């Protein structure tokens, strides 16, 4: 090869290398940040080519709809009540957050180093980084059952003088939008009056709302709490919550299918259920429930069900709990069917594992070799799956 041809070849190679490097750099470029604060009063879309930063409370009001594209990353600045960062959907407004297994929608803390949803497994935060922001709260107009016997009430931690902070009503089919393939991480900040926020809080939400494929990772309080309402939900995964995995209260009357709760060292119960406190009790249904523990502790309970609860729980597989862990059943109106409990890998088939339930034994059945529909493969998109597979 003569000198000129050699130089042209080298130049071409360098050009190719430079072009390839440029493509790589462009692919890794951090998306621009958009700070969000205050109220959203008209239909708005958050796109995947931005990182949205919630700075204190962001609320959707006046019947507006917030649409969030698949693969969008939302971060929230740290802070406690009254400066806690959170996303609040008020009654009559909607959230349309529909991700995919390949492009989930991720809510996390601004302390999280990730700059793209695809970098989730590179986060420097872990399950001990709880309580960094306020989570997501949805206020709907479906029936609730509260102490004041009113059809509506305000969410604790919000200003009771502001009527947009109220939830509940008579609309069983109330529609607050859609949430699907959404991961909510490191929430549960202090909200005043001795309480912390949940990862996802559903207050009086109606059954036209769609809740499916939701992950709550390392929240300081409950993972997901239902305050009354009639909303149905499916494919819920809660990992290492500071309190309960799933909590039902105020006469929740919906159906939840496919639940997986992985308790951490600070967790309390896999599931806690409190009945209605007002004119009606509600009537819930839970099915295909998998509860397990990373490190067994005497303080962890499998389930707590109070005396005012009414509903059914079927096909429950609880594993790896300590010998001191029990199901606390105080209600004669809750049926527990197809329970399989193992403690320290020992199969349990005895009512002695259920406190307060002996007089209600007709509502309790044990099974073995249960097969659950909520196989862990369905959660391959989650941060939980990525972290436990390391």
Name the predicted role of every residue range.
Residues 2-5, 18-38:
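Bacterial Sec-dependent N-terminal signal peptides
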Residues 73:
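Catalytic metal-binding/acid-base residues of hydrolase active sites
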Residues 31-66, 77-92, 100, 104, ...:
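Extracellular beta-rich repeat passengers
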Residues 5-8, 237:
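Jelly-roll (double-stranded beta-helix
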Residues 10-18:
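Sec-dependent signal peptide hydrophobic core
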């Amino acid at each position: 090869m003569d000198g000129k041809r050699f130089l042209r070849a080298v130049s071409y190679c360098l050009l190719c290398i430079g072009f390839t490097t440029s493509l790589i750099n462009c692919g890794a470029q951090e998306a621009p940040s958009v700070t969000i604060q205050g109220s959203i009063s008209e239909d708005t879309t958050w796109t995947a080519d931005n990182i949205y930063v919630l700075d204190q409370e962001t609320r959707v009001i006046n019947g507006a709809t917030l649409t969030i594209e698949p693969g969008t990353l939302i971060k929230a600045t740290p802070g406690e009540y009254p400066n806690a960062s959170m996303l609040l959907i008020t009654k009559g407004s909607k959230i349309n957050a529909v991700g995919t297994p390949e492009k989930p929608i991720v809510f996390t803390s601004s302390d999280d180093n990730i700059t793209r949803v695809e970098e989730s497994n590179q986060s420097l935060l872990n399950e001990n980084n709880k309580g960094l922001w306020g989570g997501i709260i949805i206020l709907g107009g479906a029936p609730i059952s509260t102490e004041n016997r009113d059809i509506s009430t305000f969410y604790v931690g919000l200003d009771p003088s502001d009527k947009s902070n109220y939830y509940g009503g008579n609309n069983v089919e109330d529609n607050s939008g859609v949430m699907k393939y959404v991961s909510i991480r490191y929430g549960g900040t202090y909200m005043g009056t001795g309480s912390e926020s949940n990862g996802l809080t559903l207050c009086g939400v109606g059954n036209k709302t769609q809740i499916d494929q939701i992950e709550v990772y390392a929240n300081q309080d409950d993972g997901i709490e239902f305050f009354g309402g009639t909303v149905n939900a499916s494919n819920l995964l809660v990992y290492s919550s500071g309190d309960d995995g799933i909590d039902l209260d105020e006469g929740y009357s919906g159906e939840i299918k496919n639940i997986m709760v992985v308790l951490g060292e600070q967790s309390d119960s896999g599931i806690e259920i409190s009945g209605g406190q007002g004119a009606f009790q509600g009537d819930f249904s839970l099915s295909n429930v998998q509860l397990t523990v990373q490190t067994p502790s005497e303080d962890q309970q499998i389930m707590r069900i109070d005396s005012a609860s009414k509903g059914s729980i079927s096909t429950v597989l609880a594993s790896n709990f300590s010998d001191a862990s029990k199901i606390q059943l105080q209600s004669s109106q809750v049926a527990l069917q197809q329970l399989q409990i193992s403690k320290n890998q020992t199969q349990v088939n005895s009512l002695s594992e259920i406190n307060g339930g002996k007089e209600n034994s007709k509502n309790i059945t044990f099974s073995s070799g249960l097969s659950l529909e909520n196989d862990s493969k369905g959660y391959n998109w989650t941060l939980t799956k990525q972290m436990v597979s390391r």
